[in-house]
Amino acid sequence: MRRASRPASVRNALTDRSAINALVRDGLGAVKDKDKQFIDPSIRTQFVDSIDTDEAFRVGRDQEPRWDYLLGHENRSLIAVEPHSAKTDEIKAVINKKRALRQQLNGHLKDEMHISKWLWVASGPVCFPRGSKYEILLSQAGIKFVGRCVLAKHLV
């Protein structure tokens, strides 16, 4: 008999000892209202829980790069979302934010857990050409630029 698959949850991904457990919110509750517009309304209910990782890791790291959100999705995956200006001179900043979050999550994320999608959503006008060397840099870093809104197709 097969067990029903459980959705991925930020709560279940964090160790019991993690100091950031208390910051996890149901659904998109940890996502700032101004940033919810970057997630398509038709998929918002698919998120089990969320954490504002920018706030969670701010103390003592004011000058370090910080990725914005980690979301638990019903398709059994953890998804990192970064609303950020989409300019060519910001690509390295977004890549550095990913590297920083991976380090910041050390000791917080259970060993068997991993983030399956790293999504960059434009928080303003897109100022770099599609299919350019910049997208190659992002792809090599494991980050998908999704344009102005995270859609269902970005979650599969």
Residues covered by each model-derived region:
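Acidic-basic catalytic patches of nuclease active cores, encompassing PD-(D/E)XK
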Residues: 1-61
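Domain-level recognition of nuclease-like catalytic cores that cleave nucleotide substrates
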Residues: 4-12, 113-156
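Conserved catalytic cores of phosphodiester-cleaving nucleases, focusing on short active-site segments
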Residues: 69-71, 75-87
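Short, flexible active-site-proximal loops enriched in glycine and acidic residues
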Residues: 106-114
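Short beta-strand-loop-alpha-helix junction that forms the active-site gateway
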Residues: 83-92, 125
